[in-house]
Amino acid sequence: MAEFKKFEKVGSQFIMKRQYGFGLVVVIGMLAFAIGGIYNKNTAVIWIFGILTVLCFISIWAQQFIIDMEKKEFIIKNGLINKPLQIPLSNFVNFELVKIKHNFITTNVSLNLYYMKDTKEKCMGIAQGFSTRSMQNLINEINEIIQPNERY
């Protein structure tokens, strides 16, 4: 069995390791605004950005992507208050890699998973980062995990 860089195997589940890249930049940016509010003695800015910083960090910490090979499903938890979404492998359609550039500089790369639900195609985000290569490596590892179990 291959060792995975982005996943940790626990029983029949493959749990994606936390990826702080893009989310941590957002949290640090909001923390900078909160600190700027301290220097300018603006309590509204301190409270607003302080609370947003904490909420965003908790949201990043709660994000999960699990591949359960016993139940043959993806389990995706995004956001602070959303319930985990369970997607059977049989409903999986494909992955989408979205790359956002500003003036030839890549600012965000996100990996989305498309699946069928009630005869409609739905989309759910899996991961975000700064490089296409890291997202492609993640796709390759997911394919290695689900490929032996007859994805098609």
Regions found by a protein language model. Give the residues of each.
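N-terminal membrane-targeting/pre-transmembrane regions
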Residues: M1-I38, K120
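Generic beta-strand structural signal
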Residues: K9, I67-M69, L97
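Short, structured motif recognition centered on aromatic/hydrophobic residues
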Residues: S12-K17, F65-I67, N108-Y115
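Membrane-embedded alpha-helical segments of small multi-pass membrane proteins
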Residues: I35, I51, L55-I58
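Hydrophobic alpha-helical transmembrane segments
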Residues: I38-L52
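Conserved beta-hairpin
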Residues: L55-P88
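Non-transmembrane, membrane-adjacent beta-strand/coil modules in membrane-associated proteins
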Residues: I76-N137
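Cytosol-/stroma-facing membrane-proximal "stalk/adaptor" domains immediately downstream
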Residues: E144-Y152
